[in-house]
């Protein structure tokens, strides 16, 4: 589920990215606490927002925005939840952030679930550099069940992004209508986006994202590119980000 990004989270995310993060709606997954590693039911992540917050959206509540933007601020200022109104923030550094579908500068941004953990990014980049994406493409082409689930993941991704944007007061973003991320619904183009989706919503939603996570976990323990959210060894370099947010 999406939880508010604290000031410390934003500092960590800036260090992870090497820049000031833009359009952060919240933290969608954390290393050590990702839904993909906890066996969470996909249904519990519908919309990427907790059930209590879903009810608030359905009832039209605007006092506390479910993803961190006030309703009168459509595209940009990072804000905190009022005390006691958000879900409790789990332990662990951010692994995936939920990004606004339109960034503060007005640019459309289709990648709702954005992978930020440097260790995860490096591990996935290693898979891509070694041609593993072709294996995923072949799997998608050969298995109709996986292809069907992948297409459903595409539809859910767009629904979640649209819902979060509406809840944040951003409104429609026609430039990215029908566009999700990672090559969905028929191609495999970016493991980073697909892994980010899988970590954010939990297993059983994005079959290729789950497959990528399994490939990383199956590497030998001695392999520096082995990665799981539960065993992530990335540590914040205290000198990595010293600028203002």
Feature locations, PLM:
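Intrinsically disordered, low-complexity tandem-repeat regions
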Residues: 40-44, 48-88
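Preference for intrinsically disordered or flexible, low-complexity segments
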Residues: 1-39, 91-245
